[in-house]
């Protein structure tokens, strides 16, 4: 039946699974089944580093089978609904109800309807209060878990903060309680109380939240004893010891970020007022260079990818960036592996850094002024020196780059018309420098 369906949809590679480096787990022999759900298309979800990390962590546990669910595209969804066929996992073609957990990555608010759609297509009651022991426990994590209340009716648990350690503690609690829970000897609320002892876990049904007339939280208190009065955000203290996937899954179709992603740091030392990511990933931590090189070497040998992206909120603030680039270039000098960076701060490219990057990849560099006037940059607390930026842009063009990308935000508080006009002016200045260099 699946082969018949795949002949009728665009990009059937989204639904076949069986990628290179896929862990071989026997679903039926696993004591605990975890559905890892990403509420968007396959090619977006497989570009998400968090999904890859949690997937590797859980499948490294001998008694756990972690399998992936992604939102189907509209053509696939229509066929599944017309045939009254539920959504299924990529690995074993199992339905969502056959799992102990359904864990959702909540990356942005626009995916919330996809969360509900996946639950509905998996024949799971949407409201947590309607789900007994026969249904999977629904967990939410990721950036949007910082504000869980809009989804509190639908989730049994939220994991506030970073999941690498906490998910193991959740699994360990469930491992010890599963038989009693599934036999209805243990009530669901009692199990949730046990989960609430894990730092970072918020079980909405254990708390009462009151709102004022404007919809803001007025009071937050526990309904029962034995649960934390406040939920603390969970974070890793040592990024060097954090698990990272070495057996990088290689999809059969092109995905959004079709390369190896190396997380070299987490958190950010800057304090831009517009940024949600800084409090989400606070405090600032970095990996040691030797650790990064080992991860890069392992990922390359297991994949053959010819591009690696250094990942972090502000990679240019990584101390030792120049040394890291030199050693990465030396490591892969015989393999033609290119190294790419996200948006960089101009001052980080002073010296040899821009030339190093240009020696391995000249497709483009990205800068993020965010606002084109100094007045507005001060309001959002964006550290960006215009004179320094223009000098670096000229240096970048001299290094061999032909394209740079500039990020700006529109709609900031206290924005004026002249702030928008200045975007054109700043972009033109950068363009004129390229013309000057190329004369």
Where are these regions (language model features)?
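DnaQ-like (DEDDh/DEDDy) 3′-5′ exonuclease domain used for proofreading
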Residues: 1-41, 45-65, 70-74, 80
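N-terminal [4Fe-4S]-dependent radical SAM core
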Residues: 5-35, 42-43, 210-261
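N-terminal pre-triad scaffold of radical SAM enzymes
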Residues: 34-40, 58, 250-276, 300
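Conserved SAM/AdoMet-binding glycine-rich loop
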Residues: 36-37, 297-439
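Short hydrophobic segments within beta-strands
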Residues: 37-39, 69, 105, 141, ...
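Conserved, mostly hydrophobic/aromatic
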Residues: 58, 156, 268, 292, ...
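Glycine-rich beta-alpha loop elements in corrinoid/cobalamin-binding modules
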Residues: 71-222
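Iron-sulfur (Fe-S) cluster-binding segments and ferredoxin-like electron-carrier domains
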Residues: 275-291
């Amino acid at each position: 039946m699946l082969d018949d369906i795949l002949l009728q949809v665009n990009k059937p590679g989204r639904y076949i699974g069986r990628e290179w480096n896929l862990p071989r787990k026997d679903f039926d022999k696993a004591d605990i089944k975890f559905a890892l759900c990403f509420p968007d298309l396959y090619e977006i979800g497989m570009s998400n580093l968090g999904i890859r990390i949690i997937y590797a962590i859980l499948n490294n546990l001998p008694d756990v089978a972690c399998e992936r669910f992604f939102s189907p595209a509209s053509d696939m969804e229509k066929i599944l609904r017309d045939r009254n066929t539920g959504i299924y996992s990529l690995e074993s073609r199992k339905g969502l109800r056959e799992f102990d957990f359904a864990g959702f990555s909540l990356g942005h608010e626009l995916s919330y309807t996809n969360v509900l759609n996946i639950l509905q297509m998996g024949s799971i009651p949407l409201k947590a209060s309607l789900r007994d022991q026969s249904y999977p426990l629904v967990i939410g994590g990721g950036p949007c878990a910082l504000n869980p209340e809009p989804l509190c009716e639908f989730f049994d648990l939220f994991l506030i903060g970073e999941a690498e350690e906490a998910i193991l503690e959740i699994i360990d609690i469930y491992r010890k309680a599963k038989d009693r829970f599934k036999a209805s000897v243990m009530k669901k609320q009692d199990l949730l109380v046990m989960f609430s002892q894990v730092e970072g876990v918020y079980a909405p049904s254990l708390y009462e939240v009151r709102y004022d007339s404007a919809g803001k939280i007025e009071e937050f208190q526990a309904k029962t004893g034995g649960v934390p009065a406040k939920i603390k955000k969970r974070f890793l203290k040592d990024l060097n010891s954090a698990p990272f996937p070495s057996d990088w899954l290689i999809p059969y179709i092109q995905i959004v970020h079709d390369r190896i992603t190396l997380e070299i740091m987490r958190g950010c030392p800057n304090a831009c007022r517009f940024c949600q990511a800084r409090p989400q990933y606070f405090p600032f931590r970095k990996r040691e260079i030797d650790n990064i090189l080992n991860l890069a070497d392992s990922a390359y040998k297991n994949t053959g990818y010819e591009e690696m992206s250094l990942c972090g909120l502000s990679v240019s603030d990584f101390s030792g960036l120049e040394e890291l680039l030199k050693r990465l270039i030396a490591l892969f000098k015989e393999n033609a592996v290119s190294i790419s960076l996200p948006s960089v701060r101009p001052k980080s490219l002073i010296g040899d850094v821009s030339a190093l990057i240009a020696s391995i990849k000249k497709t483009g560099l990205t800068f993020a002024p965010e606002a084109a006037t100094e007045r507005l940059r001060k309001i959002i607390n964006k550290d960006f020196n215009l004179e320094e930026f223009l000098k670096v842009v000229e240096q970048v063009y001299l290094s061999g780059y032909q394209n740079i990308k500039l990020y700006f935000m529109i709609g900031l508080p206290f924005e004026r018309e002249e702030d928008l006009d200045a975007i054109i002016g700043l972009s033109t200045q950068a363009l004129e420098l390229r013309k000057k260099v190329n004369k």
